[in-house]
């Protein structure tokens, strides 16, 4: 049996890791295809190293672009690869444009499609990821859900129970696996008592007004804050000339994106 994984961003690499370990344990051949949606080394390559995942056989190198551009590039480049590799099944993860593009492509080729982290819903149709996850769920042959709520969501949408499999939260599985190995790492690099902050959602970086509201909110917090700066957030803060304000907040420690192991340590130690 040969299984193909299609991934494109950091959360998907994390979800892939525990699934890959199980496939290897059962001596199932696997192929990893990286769409290249995250192409910065700190945002991509380091995760494969730290999670001990096999390097991708192929990187589509789609880079950034509009939702339609990225989705179309992935579909056009992926189709031939899937046809040549002839996998017995394809696994997609989460709710990115990579997930959407892969789900459409694989479904049209009539190859069994498995969706890990299926059934999650925000019921906010303006959210791009919500659109992606709904389409991926309804095209998938088997849907691996993290919890009962997700399973119920799928049943309400008419998906038969025999296609829904309760797998639990693979992200949490990987967190427990990693933290057991790296509990004492990075001592001294960060404050003893801190709040961990990430900031990258499209709706939170879409306007100067929105960014200023978030800055005003964190300025009222009297704890040390460790902000992991996403490239998108870095770009818009620069475009709106707000770096001086960011630097004036003495409680705010801004750091570049970190690898997965370091992130699990930060999560384990933060307030």
Regions found by a protein language model. Give the residues of each.
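Active-site and donor-binding regions of nucleotide-sugar-utilizing enzymes
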Residues: 4-9, 13-22, 47, 59-158
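Structural motif
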Residues: 2, 88-89, 194, 271
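Short, glycine-rich nucleotide/cofactor-binding loops
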Residues: 3-13, 200-209
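Short internal beta-strands
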Residues: 30-37, 143, 225-231
């Amino acid at each position: 049996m040969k299984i193909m994984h299609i991934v494109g961003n950091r959360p998907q690499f994390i979800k892939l890791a525990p699934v890959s370990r199980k496939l290897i344990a059962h001596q199932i051949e696997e192929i990893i295809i990286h769409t290249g949606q995250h192409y910065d080394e700190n945002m991509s390559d380091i995760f494969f190293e730290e999670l001990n995942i096999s390097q991708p056989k192929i990187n589509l190198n789609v880079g950034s672009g509009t939702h339609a551009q990225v989705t179309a590039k992935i579909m056009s480049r992926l189709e031939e690869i899937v046809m040549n590799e002839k996998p017995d099944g394809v696994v997609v993860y989460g709710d990115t444009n990579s997930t959407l593009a892969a789900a459409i492509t694989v479904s049209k080729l009539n190859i069994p499609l498995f969706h890990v982290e299926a059934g999650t819903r925000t019921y906010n149709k303006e959210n791009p990821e919500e659109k992606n996850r709904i389409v991926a769920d309804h095209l998938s042959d088997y849907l691996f859900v993290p919890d009962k709520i997700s399973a119920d969501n799928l049943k309400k949408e008419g998906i038969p129970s025999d296609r829904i499999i309760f797998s639990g939260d693979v992200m949490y599985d990987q967190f427990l696996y990693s933290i057991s190995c790296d509990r004492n790492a990075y001592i001294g690099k960060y404050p003893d008592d801190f709040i961990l902050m990430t900031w990258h959602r499209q709706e939170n970086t879409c306007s100067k007004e929105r960014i200023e509201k978030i800055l005003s909110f964190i300025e009222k917090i009297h704890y040390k804050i460790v902000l992991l700066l996403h490239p998108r957030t870095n770009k818009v803060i620069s475009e709106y000339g707000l770096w001086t304000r960011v630097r004036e907040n003495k409680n705010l420690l801004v750091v570049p994106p970190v690898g997965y192991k370091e992130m699990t340590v930060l999560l384990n130690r933060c307030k």
